[in-house]
C-alpha cells in the first residue's frame, strides 16, 4: 500500500457522526457502562466492556476493528446494544456488517440516525 492508500483508508475510518449523537442514540449504554464517554477512546472502552456480555467473540470484534477502525466498530457494537433484543445473533450480525464495511458498503452513521429517529418517534 502507498502512503496515499493508507491516508485514504484512515480518513474513511474516522466516524462522520459526532460522538454526542452516538451517545444520544444509544442510551442503554449507560445501564451497562458507568464511566463517562466524552472521547472516542472512552466509547471504545465501553464497547470492549459490553461486547462479551452480548456474545460477540473476540475474533468477530477484532475483524470489525480491522475493517472499520476501532471507533466505527465501537459505534456498531453500542448501536447493536440498543437493539439487542431484536438481534438473534449479535456475533453474526457484526460479521455481516464487517463484510459490508470491507467492501465499502457500510457506514455507521445511518445506523445511529435510525436509532435517534426511533427514539424521537416513540
Residue ranges of model-derived segments:
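Electrostatic interaction modules used in gene-expression and signaling proteins
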Residues: 1-122
Amino acid at each position: 500500500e502507498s502512503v496515499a492508500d493508507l491516508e485514504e483508508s484512515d480518513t474513511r475510518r474516522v466516524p462522520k457522526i459526532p460522538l454526542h449523537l452516538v451517545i444520544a442514540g444509544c442510551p442503554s449504554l449507560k445501564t451497562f457502562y458507568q464511566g463517562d464517554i466524552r472521547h472516542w477512546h472512552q466509547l471504545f472502552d465501553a464497547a470492549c466492556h459490553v461486547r462479551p456480555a452480548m456474545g460477540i467473540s473476540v475474533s468477530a470484534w477484532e475483524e470489525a476493528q480491522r475493517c472499520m477502525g476501532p471507533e466505527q466498530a465501537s459505534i456498531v457494537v453500542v448501536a447493536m446494544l440498543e437493539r439487542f433484543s431484536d438481534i438473534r445473533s449479535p456475533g453474526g450480525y457484526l460479521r455481516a456488517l464487517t463484510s459490508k464495511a470491507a467492501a465499502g458498503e457500510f457506514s455507521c452513521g445511518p445506523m445511529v440516525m435510525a436509532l435517534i429517529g426511533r427514539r424521537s418517534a416513540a
